[in-house]
């Protein structure tokens, strides 16, 4: 063999390694670029409401109509699977990496590099998806601004008028739904197509609410959701509207519509509450109408009770019929049973406290200054909504 032949042979052996290095470097570049784009989008989102409105109307629907359609085909919550993989898979992979680094002495650098790339892609995926499917949405114009609903301060008299209106409606609706031998609500409606139709029906009047809707998915490990005080959750990593199947069933239709509102870009909790109420209120299904009014009554009742005298509280509560009270108390009993549950994998009080702090922190980091208290702003939105319609 000649010297030239030997050199060519050596080069042919080295080329795959060089090629691999180039491949790895491109992965790093790709991740850095995606994270950089995410950072830029977040900066623009905080600075420009107009950009966020444009993004929500024209770009965000692309993810729903592609990725959302794909995950909707699955008969289970893909988001729940991703959480399971993250909770169990990542710690196990760290253990596997340490074992391989110890055992494969001659390939420690290569092993660390492979696992490093995997973790780098995971971080990139989280940052990018959270930005595209969640963070930007927090900085849009409000639902009221987008849809021409006036915003103004309201008197206690108007609040009490709204409360009385809700009581009148829900008392009548309570006679239209099925009940068991104990007088408690029995769900007869489906939790997917009816919810999608109810939400889609708002599309002709309100921006961004028409078109395709993802399929709502029940969470298998719903008790853990209950420990976190969650009735539903929009999961941006799977573009899914997930719900707690263990909770009291009268609350499910409204909860599902609430999560579907998030998949249309309305990420603020108070706005999703209002949208869910409107969808349920306009639904042809009695279960949905009842669920919407039950959720709304709870919010308005809490607002009235913030200032009302004992006599006024008694007067208001006495106007609510026995059937509605049966459902309100059954709902409270469920959440109380979760708090008092024994022999659970995780302590309910500890899980609830961690979840509450995490939610509060997340909301404030995304510009929601009053954190979880923002949920209660739904009452102000309802007052504006009904007043704009001339019904208050």
Residue map of PLM features:
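Cytoplasmic juxtamembrane regions at transmembrane-helix boundaries
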Residues: 13-14, 20-22, 95-120
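Membrane-embedded alpha-helical segments of integral membrane proteins
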Residues: 37-100
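Active-site recognition of the HExxH zinc-binding catalytic motif
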Residues: 75, 252-273, 277-278
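Transmembrane alpha-helices and immediately adjacent membrane-cytoplasm interface residues
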Residues: 90-95, 110-144
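Membrane-interface segments at or immediately adjacent to transmembrane helices
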Residues: 135-203
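Post-HExxH zinc-binding segment in Zn-dependent metallohydrolases
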Residues: 166, 267-315
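Auxiliary, metal-adjacent structural segments of Zn-dependent hydrolase domains
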Residues: 178-245, 249
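Pan-zinc metallopeptidase signature
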Residues: 329-392
């Amino acid at each position: 063999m000649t010297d030239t032949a030997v050199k060519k042979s050596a080069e042919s052996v080295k080329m795959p390694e060089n090629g691999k290095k180039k491949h790895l470097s491109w992965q790093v570049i790709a991740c850095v670029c995606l994270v950089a784009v995410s950072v830029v989008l977040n900066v623009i989102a905080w600075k420009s409401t107009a950009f966020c409105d444009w993004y929500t109307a024209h770009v965000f629907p692309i993810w729903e109509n592609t990725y959302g359609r794909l995950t909707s085909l699955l008969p289970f919550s893909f988001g729940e699977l991703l959480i399971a993989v993250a909770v169990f898979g990542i710690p196990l992979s760290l253990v596997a990496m340490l074992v391989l680094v110890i055992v494969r002495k001659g390939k420690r650098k290569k092993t660390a590099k492979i696992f490093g790339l995997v973790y780098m892609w995971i971080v990139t995926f989280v940052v990018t998806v959270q930005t595209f499917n969640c963070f930007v949405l927090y900085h849009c114009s409000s639902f009221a601004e987008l849809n021409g609903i006036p915003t103004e301060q309201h008197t206690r008299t108007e609040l009490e008028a709204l409360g009385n209106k809700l009581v009148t409606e829900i008392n009548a609706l309570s006679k239209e739904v099925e009940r068991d031998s104990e007088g408690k609500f029995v769900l007869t409606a489906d939790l997917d197509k009816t919810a999608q139709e109810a939400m889609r029906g708002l599309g002709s009047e309100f921006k961004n609410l028409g078109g395709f809707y993802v399929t709502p998915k029940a969470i298998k490990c719903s008790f853990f959701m209950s420990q976190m005080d969650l009735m539903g959750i929009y999961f941006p990593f799977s573009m899914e509207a997930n719900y707690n199947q263990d909770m009291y069933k009268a609350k499910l239709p409204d909860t599902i519509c609430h999560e579907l509102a998030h998949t249309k870009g309305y990420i603020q909790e108070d706005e999703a509450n209002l949208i869910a109420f409107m969808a349920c209120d306009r639904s042809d299904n009695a279960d949905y109408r009842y669920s919407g009014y039950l959720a709304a009554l709870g919010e308005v009742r809490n607002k009235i009770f913030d200032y009302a005298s004992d006599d006024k509280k008694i007067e208001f509560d006495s106007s609510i019929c026995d059937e509605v009270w049966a459902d309100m108390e059954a709902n409270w009993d469920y959440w109380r049973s979760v708090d008092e549950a024994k022999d659970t994998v995780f302590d309910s009080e500890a899980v609830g406290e961690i979840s509450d702090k995490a939610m509060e922190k997340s909301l404030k980091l995304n510009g929601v200054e009053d954190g979880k208290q923002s949920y209660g702003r739904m009452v102000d939105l309802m007052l504006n909504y009904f007043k704009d319609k001339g019904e208050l």
